[in-house]
């Protein structure tokens, strides 16, 4: 069983702020009796009854338990989105680790909910979001008026990510709230580029002005670039081999270069680091996931990454760890901390807001904080209730990291055993903990 976590809104974000909201509503002439009750209601984040129900429902996965919701609404998606649509399994509702599809069947959510529901559907802890609305906390803010909850969330993230570290200019010290992982990664790429190009005419000449920035990414099995996935912005897509003619023009005009590194091959990393830090070239950054979930769940080893980071420090090359998919699935909330890594950028999202809001963020070291405000911002990036969802998820995980780790290890070990029982079908099981992929010889 998970450790019991219970809190009211006042417990989670502080009585002083909640009272300020209530006082403001009273000053507007509103009755605050219901709001006051909501502010002090203690919510059990994951009751024992909910945990038991989650376990019991496993036996009915795949079964139809209610009549299908038959409808002719197919949406108006683009050709590719419509081709990929399986509306029969789209959720009518969900609870815990399951959803009920439009076909009336019970589905185990798994990868279908794409990493962003580690707490499952309708997690009780998120009732505090409903209570925040009852209290009168508004969601919409602006970059120049980031609300109290968002500022508190930023501070709690920095505290959590630096826990146990010695302060330095490599310490993660600031946060940009950017809604989507694609924009969060792009912000990191922009900050890497500010060492080569001016963001605008008000900036001084960059430290590596005149040299060609070289970005390191992970290679696929044949040495190409398709294994790395860092979102859908144009620049990030050129990093993985998309827009080939555009990238060819970029490289031939020496604007930047993308170099792929063989998976877990430190000698390849070392030779390319030396090669691209001579003459006209300079390494601009090393971008990586830890579990390549868009490429067979291949895991980068701690030994490879630690050695790669040592080389990055030697050659003044910032590191960006993309934890959009892996965050919140491991003890301590960040997988890179379990590896003992100290990156300049950490991109998080999906798991932190638990599927309640799009709320990705990039955490930045002091030495790489180089953009002006309009260098990377999103109008809706600092929504207050989205930040509250972060704080709720973080509170639960802070109390349950050890148990989550034990579940992850048990799951991985048992899945590996299943693979060994079918050696003619399964070539290997890749990944770590909850993020795993089964490799078959053929499909």
Where are these regions (language model features)?
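Active-site nucleophile and cofactor-binding loops and adjacent substrate-binding regions
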Residues: 141-151, 174-185, 325, 348-353, ...
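Conserved PLP-binding catalytic core of the aspartate aminotransferase-like
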Residues: 408-412, 422-443
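Structural signature of PLP-dependent enzymes
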Residues: 393-416, 428
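Active-site PLP attachment segment
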Residues: 340-371, 382-389
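Active-site core of PLP-dependent enzymes with the aminotransferase class I/II
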Residues: 271, 291-315, 375
């Amino acid at each position: 069983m998970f450790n019991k976590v219970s809190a009211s809104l006042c417990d989670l974000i502080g009585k002083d702020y909640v009272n300020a909201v209530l006082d403001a509503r009273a000053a507007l002439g509103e009755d605050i009796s219901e709001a006051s009750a909501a502010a002090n209601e203690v919510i059990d984040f994951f009751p024992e009854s909910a945990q038991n129900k989650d376990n019991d429902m496993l036996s009915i996965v795949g079964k139809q338990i209610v009549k299908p919701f038959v409808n002719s609404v197919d949406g108006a998606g683009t050709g590719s989105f419509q081709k990929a649509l399986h509306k029969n399994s789209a959720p009518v509702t969900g609870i815990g680790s399951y959803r009920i599809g439009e076909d009336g069947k019970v589905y185990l959510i798994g990868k279908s909910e794409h990493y962003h529901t580690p707490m499952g559907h309708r997690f009780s802890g998120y009732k505090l979001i409903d209570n925040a609305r009852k209290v009168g906390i508004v969601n919409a803010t602006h970059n120049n008026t980031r609300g109290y909850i968002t500022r508190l969330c930023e501070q709690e993230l920095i505290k959590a990510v630096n826990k146990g570290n010695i302060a330095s200019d490599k310490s993660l010290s600031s946060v940009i709230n950017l809604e989507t992982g694609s924009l969060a990664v792009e912000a990191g790429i922009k900050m890497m580029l500010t060492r080569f190009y001016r963001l605008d005419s008000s900036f001084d000449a960059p430290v590596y002005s005149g040299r060609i920035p070289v970005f390191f990414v992970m290679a696929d099995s044949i040495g190409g670039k398709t294994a790395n996935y860092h979102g859908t912005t144009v620049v990030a897509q050129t990093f993985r081999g998309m827009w080939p003619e555009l990238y060819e023009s970029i490289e031939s005009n020496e604007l930047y270069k993308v170099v792929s590194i063989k998976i877990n091959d430190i000698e390849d990393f070392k030779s390319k680091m030396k090669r691209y830090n001579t003459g006209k070239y300079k390494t601009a950054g090393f971008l990586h996931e830890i579990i390549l979930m868009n490429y067979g769940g291949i895991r980068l080893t701690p030994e490879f990454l630690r050695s790669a980071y040592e080389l990055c420090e030697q050659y003044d090359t910032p590191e960006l760890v993309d934890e959009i998919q892996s965050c919140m699935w491991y003890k301590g909330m960040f997988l890179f901390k379990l590896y003992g890594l100290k990156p300049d950028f950490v991109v998080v999202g999906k798991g932190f807001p638990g599927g309640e809001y799009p709320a990705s963020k990039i955490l930045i070291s002091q030495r790489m904080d180089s953009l002006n405000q309009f260098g990377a911002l999103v109008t809706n990036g600092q929504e207050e209730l989205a930040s509250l969802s972060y704080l709720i998820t973080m509170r639960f995980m802070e109390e349950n990291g050890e148990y989550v780790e034990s579940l992850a290890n048990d799951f991985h070990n048992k899945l590996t055993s299943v693979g060994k029982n079918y050696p003619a079908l399964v070539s290997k099981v890749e990944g770590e903990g909850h993020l795993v992929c089964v490799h078959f010889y053929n499909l």
